[in-house]
């Protein structure tokens, strides 16, 4: 771990002030909780001339839930998400996902926006500067080789945020502010499958809030993750699901994944499983969909095929639990 390169620190009080600072300081980075950014800076990942502290912008701390849906500011801490009574009643999957992130100390300062915009990770990238230099810089650090897939020219660093899959199954969209004004887009469109540049945020743009539409009365949602230890660690694979049932059959199914690809994503093909009971045949088909669509690479200390199998089993078990099904233990 190295000494952090010198930088200026500024604390705007409005979104307009923040936009002006970004426009005036090329290369500036936003900071809120800093639980991911600061360790990366200590490892020499990036040397921004300025950190723009967003924690003083009141608009980013809004948390409102009405019959029209929920608005959750990007500055809302994960500890607040995990314990807020409104969230636990209306959107318990968000509280559940927030509670899995890191440890209690991290969650008191880590924010929703930071988790949604979490940098992608790879064992060949998240190392000290001397380690990266001695092993040849990778694509994500300005080099010309991906150590995970040396024959390719795409970075495969994995996205490891826990809140994104939960918000994806809830149908959330995000509000973004920048030098050209505000815009809204589906959360899925915030990401692309490129580990070196996985966010679609433009220069000077910041995440303002996530907006969640009202949820069906009969919908149940949950989040599960696998990690090396029972706390602190990023997901090797994480799965969120939202299930609607009627008369013993699934009428709607959404599944989203994290930790396996360069972006969190909604599983495709689940519409073909609706109208059926949550039996072993349906859950086996669901597991096969997961195995086909995840793309884990050797970006963690575990084997990629293990993460593929784990993601499928997590999706199967969680869907079964939410739908009230009873099936035999799956064989990967």
Q: What would you call each of these model-derived segments?
A:
Residues 1-332:
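C-terminal structural segment of proteins
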């Amino acid at each position: 771990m190295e000494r952090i390169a010198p930088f200026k620190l500024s604390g705007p009080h409005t979104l307009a002030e923040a936009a002006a600072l970004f426009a005036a300081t090329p290369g500036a980075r936003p900071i809120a909780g800093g639980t991911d950014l600061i360790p990366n800076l200590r490892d020499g990942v990036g040397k921004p001339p300025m950190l723009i502290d967003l924690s003083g912008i009141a608009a980013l701390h809004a948390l409102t839930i009405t019959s029209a849906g929920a608005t959750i500011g990007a500055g809302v801490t994960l500890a607040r998400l995990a314990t807020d009574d409104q969230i636990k009643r209306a959107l318990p999957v968000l509280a559940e996902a927030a509670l899995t992130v890191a440890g209690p100390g991290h969650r008191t300062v880590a924010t929703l926006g930071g988790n949604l915009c979490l940098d992608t990770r790879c064992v060949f990238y998240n190392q000290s500067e001397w380690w990266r230099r001695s092993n040849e810089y990778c694509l994500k650090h300005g080099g010309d080789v991906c150590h995970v897939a040396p024959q390719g020219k795409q970075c495969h660093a994995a996205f490891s945020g826990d809140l994104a899959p939960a918000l994806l199954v809830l149908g959330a969209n995000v509000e973004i502010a920048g030098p050209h004004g505000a815009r809204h887009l589906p959360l899925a469109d915030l990401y692309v499958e490129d580990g070196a540049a996985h966010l679609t945020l433009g220069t000077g743009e910041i995440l303002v809030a996530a907006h969640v539409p009202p949820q069906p009365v009969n919908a149940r949602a949950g989040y599960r993750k696998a990690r090396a230890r029972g706390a602190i660690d990023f997901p090797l694979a994480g799965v969120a699901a939202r299930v609607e049932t009627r008369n013993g059959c699934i009428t709607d199914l959404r599944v989203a994944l994290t930790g396996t690809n360069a972006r969190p994503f909604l599983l495709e093909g689940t519409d073909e499983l609706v109208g059926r009971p949550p039996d072993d045949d349906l859950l086996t088909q669901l597991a096969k969909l997961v195995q086909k669509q995840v793309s884990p690479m050797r970006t963690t200390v575990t084997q990629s095929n293990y993460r593929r199998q784990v993601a499928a089993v997590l999706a199967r078990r969680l869907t079964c639990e939410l739908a009230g099904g009873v099936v035999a233990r799956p064989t990967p």
